[in-house]
A protein has these predicted regions:
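Short, well-structured beta-strand-loop connectors
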Residues: 51-64, 83
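Internal alpha/beta scaffold segment
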Residues: 122, 171-218, 305
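N-terminal, Lys/Arg-enriched amphipathic/low-complexity engagement segments
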Residues: 1-45, 49
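Acidic low-complexity segments
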Residues: 83, 88-145, 149-150, 205
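Conserved small/polar residues in nucleotide/adenosyl-binding loops
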Residues: 303-310
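Gly-rich Lys/Arg/Thr-decorated short loops/hinges at beta-loop-alpha junctions or inter-strand turns
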Residues: 155-169, 290
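Hydrophobic alpha-helical positions that pack around
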Residues: 194-300
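Conserved hydrophobic positions within beta-strands
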Residues: 79-81
Length: 320
């Protein structure tokens, strides 16, 4: 009976609705205006560095991390700062926000260039400058995650994408495998973690095959197919399935010798190390009953959901 309960706790069999798995990301129209929040991560809010009337570019740092557990914020558009003002978050709290009127040019900031990384200190500084946080949903600052007090022997890449509808991570693996590998190798090299396991649910055979080919000559990286059950992507379950270890109650993955990164997070890191472009856009899946044409889209940060042309406004909640 206990074994049955344990198996049930490690995932639930749910119907897969991955209709967008083959949908290559389509660029979303550039919004006329964006509101970029200074609190979009776990930890202290960033401190706004710009004022009304300032000109900004794609990649301009507009928010400075407000503490050790915090993150830098960068402009996703080029244009002019229309306002720096308080904004109420969904949890009822207030935070500063930067409103930018876009100029439609998407001019890249001249300061954007690949970081010079030579050792662990410069690597962690680059990750912090990038403003990278967990893109799987938690939003924890990546540079902090990569500095655990515990001894860690495994970098675990969460590529399971077990959520029933989402396929953006699938497209990230298919389209950006070189960035993923670059990010992984950098983490291993500069943190001293000896090995990496990429956990992918077995309903993504193309992703498994591609990443196996990309890593076949690297003994430090293993691609591990996982059962396609809902819940596999929860990091505590992922650790047990990939490493056979349990995280202590109230503990962190590092207490089980692992650091867990989402596959899009490590891909974004790989892109940043090659180009110097911080987190200013991402691929997301738009799907569901209110969407006439489910698809993956590439959107600059803080593009409004209602800008998606195939959404049925009448079937969306008023707050969306």
């Amino acid at each position: 009976m206990l074994n049955k309960l344990k198996r049930a706790a490690l995932g639930a069999h749910t119907p897969h609705d991955k209709a967008t798995a083959a949908s290559k990301p389509v660029p979303m129209p550039l919004p006329a205006q964006v509101r970029i929040l200074m609190s979009q991560h776990i930890g202290a809010p960033a401190k706004a560095l710009v004022k009304k009337g300032d000109e900004v570019f794609v990649g301009t740092k507009i928010g400075e991390a407000g503490g050790f557990v915090s993150a830098n914020i960068h402009s996703s558009v080029s244009g002019t700062v229309a306002a720096v003002e308080a904004f109420r978050l969904s949890n009822g709290r207030m935070c500063d926000s930067v409103v930018i009127k876009t100029d439609g040019k998407q001019t890249v900031d001249p300061a954007v260039k690949a970081p010079e990384v030579t050792d662990k200190a410069s690597f962690l500084a680059a990750v912090r400058e990038c403003g990278l946080v967990g893109l799987g949903g938690a939003g924890f600052p990546t540079d902090v995650k990569l500095q655990p007090k515990q001894s860690v022997d495994t970098l675990l890449i969460n590529a399971s994408e077990c959520e029933v509808w989402l396929t953006s991570d699938t497209q990230e693996m298919l389209e950006c495998s070189d960035d993923i590998i670059r990010g992984i190798k950098a983490v291993l090299k500069y943190t001293g973690i000896p090995k990496c396991i990429i956990g992918i649910e077995n309903n993504k055979p193309e992703c498994i095959d591609l990443l196996c080919k990309k890593t076949k000559d690297d003994s430090t990286i293993e691609v591990k197919p996982l059962p396609s059950v809902y819940g596999t992507g929860a990091e505590l379950i992922l650790i047990e399935k990939c490493l056979g270890r349990e995280v202590p109650h109230g503990g962190l993955p590092a207490d089980a010798g692992a650091i867990v990164m989402n596959v899009t997070s490590v891909s974004t890191l790989g892109k940043y190390l090659a180009t110097g472009m911080p987190v200013v856009q991402r691929t997301i899946t738009v799907d569901g009953d209110a969407c006439a044409k489910p698809q993956n889209v590439v959107a600059v940060s803080y593009t409004h959901l209602r800008a998606h042309e195939t959404l049925s406004r009448s079937r969306m909640p008023s707050s969306a």
